[in-house]
């Protein structure tokens, strides 16, 4: 058996097409164009690439994108004042603060400063709290994108044993809440977990987001399981690999995401989806 590939690139492209169509419909109806403000502090190469992709995505779907490229020495106060201005700007539906930030800045305080209705990354404690209470509003982009990928498989998630490897605030923890909402029995594994292989081997669905290349071995994967690999790691030869050993997982899994081309494109597409939602439902 060879796993079915979950083509995140194609699914994300279709989602962007739907968003672009809706933006055009709004334009024809005389409604305001959705706006996204993107804040980048410093010159981290990976962050610069991510931000450039997000800006291109905005252009593709017809959003108004505001770019704020700030020097590394930008102060906490200056960033706070910028966020306050964007919070008050009616043309801005979403505010994206690109992480990581330089060490002298307190990311938690800055993320909390973003108005919850403009928190299109879904990181604000208010939005995480709503997800925990089963009344999600703006949902974290990567878990939201993963749920869209899972829907594309047509598999019924109710009653599945789901294992998440990695307990970050960005992926692991909100992913657990999303899967609980979907009716799964959820186990979250982390650096202190004993017998990781055993947990993975019992999973009908495994989501790996640990940032460690090759952490999950293919032979651990249960026959027919769904494997979602969030990891994206660059090797010395420049090749991008995930947190799962893809070559050995492929013949065992029922469904699997490739790296690259799996989860990453969906994260970006869901940022756009959240921004459109904010414009249409929260900023009427």
Curated annotation (Swiss-Prot):
Catalysis performed (reactions): (6R)-5,10-methylene-5,6,7,8-tetrahydrofolate + NADP(+) = (6R)-5,10-methenyltetrahydrofolate + NADPH; (6R)-5,10-methenyltetrahydrofolate + H2O = (6R)-10-formyltetrahydrofolate + H(+)
Binding site for NADP(+): 166-168, 232
Functional pathway: One-carbon metabolism; tetrahydrofolate interconversion
Gene3D superfamilies cross-referenced by the UniProt entry: Leucine Dehydrogenase, chain A, domain 1, NAD(P)-binding Rossmann-like Domain
UniProt-listed Enzyme Commission number(s): 1.5.1.5, 3.5.4.9
GO molecular function: methenyltetrahydrofolate cyclohydrolase activity; methylenetetrahydrofolate dehydrogenase (NADP+) activity
InterPro entries: Aminoacid_DH-like_N_sf, NAD(P)-bd_dom_sf, THF_DH/CycHdrlase, THF_DH/CycHdrlase_cat_dom, THF_DH/CycHdrlase_NAD-bd_dom
Disulfide links within the chain: none
Residue stretches in coiled coil: none
GO annotations of cellular component type: cytosol
Sorted UniProt keywords: Amino-acid biosynthesis, Histidine biosynthesis, Hydrolase, Methionine biosynthesis, Multifunctional enzyme, NADP, One-carbon metabolism, Oxidoreductase, Purine biosynthesis
SUPFAM superfamilies per the UniProt record, alphabetical: Aminoacid dehydrogenase-like, N-terminal domain, NAD(P)-binding Rossmann-fold domains
GO BP terms in the entry: L-histidine biosynthetic process; methionine biosynthetic process; purine nucleotide biosynthetic process; tetrahydrofolate interconversion
Keyword match Manganese: no
Record flagged with keyword Amino-acid biosynthesis: yes
TM spans (from-to): none
Subunit and interaction comment: Homodimer.
Similarity field: Belongs to the tetrahydrofolate dehydrogenase/cyclohydrolase family.
Physiological role: Catalyzes the oxidation of 5,10-methylenetetrahydrofolate to 5,10-methenyltetrahydrofolate and then the hydrolysis of 5,10-methenyltetrahydrofolate to 10-formyltetrahydrofolate.
Protein name: Bifunctional protein FolD
Annotated source species: Pseudomonas putida (strain W619)
Species classification: Bacteria, Pseudomonadati, Pseudomonadota, Gammaproteobacteria, Pseudomonadales
Gene that encodes the chain: folD
């Amino acid at each position: 058996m060879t796993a079915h590939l979950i083509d995140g690139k194609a699914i994300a492209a279709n989602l962007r097409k739907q968003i672009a169509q809706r933006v055009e419909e709004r334009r024809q109806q005389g409604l305001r164009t959705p706006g996204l403000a993107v804040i980048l502090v410093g010159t981290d190469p990976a962050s610069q690439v991510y931000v450039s992709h997000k800006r291109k995505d905005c252009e593709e779907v017809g959003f108004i994108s505001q770019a704020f490229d700030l020097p590394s020495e930008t102060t906490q106060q200056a960033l706070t004042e910028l966020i306050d201005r964007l919070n008050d700007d009616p043309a801005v539906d979403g505010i994206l603060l690109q992480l990581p930030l330089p060490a002298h800045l307190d990311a938690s305080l800055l993320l909390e400063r973003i108005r919850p209705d403009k928190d299109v990354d879904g990181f604000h404690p208010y939005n995480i709290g709503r997800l925990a209470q089963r009344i999600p509003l703006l949902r974290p982009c990567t878990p939201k994108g993963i749920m869209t990928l899972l829907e594309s498989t047509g598999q019924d998630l109710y009653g599945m044993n789901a294992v998440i490897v990695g307990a970050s605030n960005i992926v692991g923890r909100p992913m657990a809440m999303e899967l609980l909402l979907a009716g799964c029995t959820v186990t979250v594994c982390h650096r202190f977990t004993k017998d990781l292989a055993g947990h993975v081997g019992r999973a009908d669905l495994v989501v790996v987001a640990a940032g460690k290349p090759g952490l999950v071995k293919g032979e651990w994967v249960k026959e027919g399981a769904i494997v979602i690999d969030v990891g994206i790691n660059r090797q010395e030869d420049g090749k991008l690999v995930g947190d799962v050993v893809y070559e050995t997982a492929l013949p065992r899994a029922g469904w699997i995401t490739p790296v690259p081309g799996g989860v990453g494109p969906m994260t970006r597409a869901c940022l756009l989806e959240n921004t459109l939602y904010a414009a249409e439902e929260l900023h009427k």
